[in-house]
Amino acid sequence: ENVMFPLDMFSNDTLRDRIRRARFCLDRVNLIDAQKKYPGEISGGMQKRVAIARAIALNPQYLFCDEPNSGLDPKTSLVIDELIHDITTEYNITTIVNTHDMNSVMGIGDSIIYIYQGHKEWEGTKDEVFNATNQRLNDFIFASDLLKKVKEENK
């Protein structure tokens, strides 16, 4: 029902086609076996994948993800990042991700915009991040030891 909602609201397809599309989207996020479960019966990571399936149900040109990894363990966060990246590439969707997870930014970001106190402070590619001179950006992005190590290796 969750994935069917946008199809029921905004699609003129037959019920059979809407069900087929919903099942396709659930299968795409590896949740076809959970299609009969209620939200309270699935994990946080599965709930995030349902949200992605619902978001792609209408074949959008744009996908907006607000903190897609919040509340998830590192392994599940990586699964969500890979899923967002794969779907973005596979369906040629422009995806905007709002996140504080710098590992995610550096893992799936192509173009990065750093916003500080509501203003765009820096913009560039993830490769350009390694050479950025903006101190606030560097302090924020490279706060984790893992990313500090990656930066050193890219010098």
What are these regions (language model features)?
Residues 63-66:
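Catalytic Walker B motif of ABC-type/P-loop ATPase nucleotide-binding domains
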Residues 74-76:
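Helix N-cap at the start of a conserved alpha-helix in ABC-type nucleotide-binding domains
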